[in-house]
């Protein structure tokens, strides 16, 4: 099976990045064909066989072509080889995926369109532009209040489509973008769950994608970059209509992780994880931890959620921890953690114990968006806090200030 994605390639091309990320998550091989807008797409053959409006992206298969990015997304999801059910597990879930793909286009993309035109064409923003954004994000926030993912219990291409649509809201709305991430935290959590998947990160880096608030563009949209020239702006504006033209971005070499270059430690984290999983915590695993712990090669932290007053429903708090751990997936090799929900059903706190490779907080942990949502306290002397650490490892004990409702282990 041969799949070729015809597209203009640019660090700002969210539609193409969405498709490449979905293909990576689905373990579906897709070859990217960099095209020049105004050439291949304007030929009669292209309009007759690929896209009648002469737009990118187009997916070329052995049987024919598919145009429109969400239609391509559906096709990739139907070819899913990951075993992750990216198009849902049942016919109903498949239809629910479809409804969120429609939502991403008719609601999220439509609400961001004035900001895209403002950034790339210099068009004035309508006075009520943010009203529409808040209306859409309020609806999304309410849906995610009781759910980790948009459909079912696992990530689907619905989450991928909505996350990449959200990207423009966070990056193009100037100062409002950051405020949106704080006001609609469930939506931002879901966004980060998609964007911090290792395969998504690899796709974005390989395409030279930019992160954070967009720099450059129209006045007030960023700093540090000159405004695009007229020709570039016109090409970029076409991105809003699905017809981008950009230059091939240089591939970024994968940098070694500094944690892999640390000297060997007598405390083997994987060995402790096996002890913790297979033996009694108080009598075997905890003593093993203190016997082998290497203070020169590891750092232990307490952490506490900053917004515990917002925790109203236990299952929602559990989902918050689950999403946090998913976004820490790339850190698993270098970390062990226990997160506890303590208190009562409708009034409870998140507290946690973490052990990280190296001295201090690793950069790869600092880069996880959730890290800033917690207050962190380094344990200066692990042996001196043996009782408290043992209680946290065991999910019970006198040093835990409130009853433990449930817990989750990162190992």
Swiss-Prot record:
Region (Disordered): 212-265
A GO MF label: translation elongation factor activity
Domain of life the protein comes from: Eukaryota
InterPro entries: EF-GSTs, EF1B_G_C, EF1B_G_C_sf, Glutathione-S-Trfase_C-like, Glutathione-S-Trfase_C_sf, Glutathione_S-Trfase, Glutathione_S-Trfase_N, GST_C
Description of how the protein assembles with itself and partners: EF-1 is composed of four subunits: alpha, beta, delta, and gamma.
Species per Swiss-Prot/TrEMBL record: Trypanosoma cruzi
Job of this protein: Probably plays a role in anchoring the complex to other cellular components.
A GO-annotated cellular component: cytoplasm
Domain GST C-terminal: 90-216
UniProt keyword terms in alphabetical order: Elongation factor, Protein biosynthesis
Protein name from the UniProt record: Elongation factor 1-gamma
One Pfam family per UniProt: EF1G
Gly residues: bias regions: 214-223
Domain EF-1-gamma C-terminal: 255-411
Domain GST N-terminal, chain residue ranges per copy: 3-84
């Amino acid at each position: 099976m041969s799949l070729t994605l015809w597209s203009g390639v640019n660090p700002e091309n969210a539609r193409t990045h969405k498709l490449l990320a979905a293909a990576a998550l689905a373990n579906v091989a897709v070859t990217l064909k960099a095209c020049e807008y105004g050439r291949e797409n304007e030929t009669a053959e292209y309009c007759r066989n690929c896209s009648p409006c002469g737009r990118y992206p187009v997916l070329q298969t052995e049987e024919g072509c598919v145009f429109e990015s969400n239609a391509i997304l559906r096709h990739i999801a139907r070819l899913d080889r990951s075993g992750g059910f990216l198009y849902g597990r049942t016919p109903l879930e498949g239809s629910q995926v479809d409804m969120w793909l429609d939502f991403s286009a008719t609601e999220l993309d439509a609400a961001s369109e004035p900001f895209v035109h403002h950034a790339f064409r210099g068009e004035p923003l309508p006075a009520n532009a943010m009203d529409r954004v808040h209306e859409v994000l309020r609806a999304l926030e309410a849906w995610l209040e009781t759910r980790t993912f948009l459909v079912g219990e696992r990530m689907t291409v619905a989450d991928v489509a909505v996350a990449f649509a959200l990207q423009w809201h966070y990056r193009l709305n100037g100062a409002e973008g950051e405020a949106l991430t704080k006001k609609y935290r469930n939506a931002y959590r879901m966004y980060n769950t998609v964007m911090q998947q290792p395969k998504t990160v690899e796709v974005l880096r390989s395409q030279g994608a930019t992160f954070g608030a967009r720099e450059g563009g129209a006045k007030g949209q960023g700093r540090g970059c000159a405004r695009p020239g007229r020709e570039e702006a016109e090409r970029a504006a076409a991105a809003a209509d699905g017809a981008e033209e950009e230059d091939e971005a240089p591939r970024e070499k994968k940098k070694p992780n500094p944690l892999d270059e640390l000297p060997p430690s007598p405390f083997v984290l994987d060995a402790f994880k096996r002890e913790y999983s297979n033996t009694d915590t108080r009598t075997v695993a905890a003593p093993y931890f203190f016997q082998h712990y290497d203070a020169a090669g590891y750092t232990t932290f307490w952490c506490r959620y900053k917004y515990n007053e917002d925790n109203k429903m236990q299952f929602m708090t559990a989902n918050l921890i689950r999403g946090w751990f998913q976004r820490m997936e790339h850190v698993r090799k270098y970390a062990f953690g226990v997160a506890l929900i303590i208190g009562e059903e409708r009034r409870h706190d998140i507290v946690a114990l973490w052990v990280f490779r190296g001295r201090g907080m690793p950069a790869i942990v600092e880069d996880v968006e959730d890290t800033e949502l917690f207050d962190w306290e380094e344990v200066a002397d692990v042996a001196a806090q043996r009782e408290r650490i043992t209680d946290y490892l065991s999910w019970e004990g006198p040093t835990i200030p409130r009853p433990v409702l449930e817990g989750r282990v990162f190992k």
